[in-house]
Amino acid sequence: GSSMGMDEKSIVNSYDELKKQVLSLLEKYDRNVLVEEYIEGQDLSMIYVEGIGALGPCIVNCDSEFYDYEMKTIKDDTVDIQTTNGEFESLKNIVLTIAEKLDIKGYAKIDFRKKDDKYYLIEVNSQVSFHPTGEFITCAKTDGYSFDDIINYIVEKALETNDKKNSIGYKVIDN
């Protein structure tokens, strides 16, 4: 998750560069390597929360060509996550369709890339970071949910779904 294994060498422009990068990753991680076409453009994310719907988006602005694992996990001044509303209502409908077609349970972060006024689906991620300043929480805040609101909601829904609410004594904390 979080683009682990990705860095500035991950964007390649020739077969030789591709081969070198794939071999390096196979040696380092000893597992399959996913290769995708690179699409230039603006990164943005939305989230889906079952029972609430599509929230966000948040737009990632960073000084680097690639928003890598380190930037996602160690926040600094090179990354600015902005929120915006307005032009994204149609994208929210697309997120709802994705959630329905993939039968997403619980929650997911859906990443897009915008190029020439077109949105390209990059990935659907069900293993998201709940870092208070990360994309998932920032998207929730766009639609008025606080960190505590969204975390408590997700935990409560998960416990209801798994019928464990009373067996472990979980209690939602009121703010």
Predicted regions and their residues:
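Short Gly/Pro-enriched turn/cap motifs at secondary-structure boundaries
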Residues: 1, 25, 37-38, 99-103
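Phosphate-binding site of ATP-dependent enzymes
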Residues: 15-87, 93, 114, 118-120
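Hydrophobic pocket-lining residues within nucleotide cofactor-binding pockets
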Residues: 12, 39, 130
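Conserved aromatic
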Residues: 12-15, 144
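A conserved helix-loop-beta module that forms one wall/lid of the active-site cleft
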Residues: 1-11
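Short small-residue beta-strand/loop micro-motif enriched in glycine and branched aliphatics
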Residues: 5-6, 78-79, 131-136
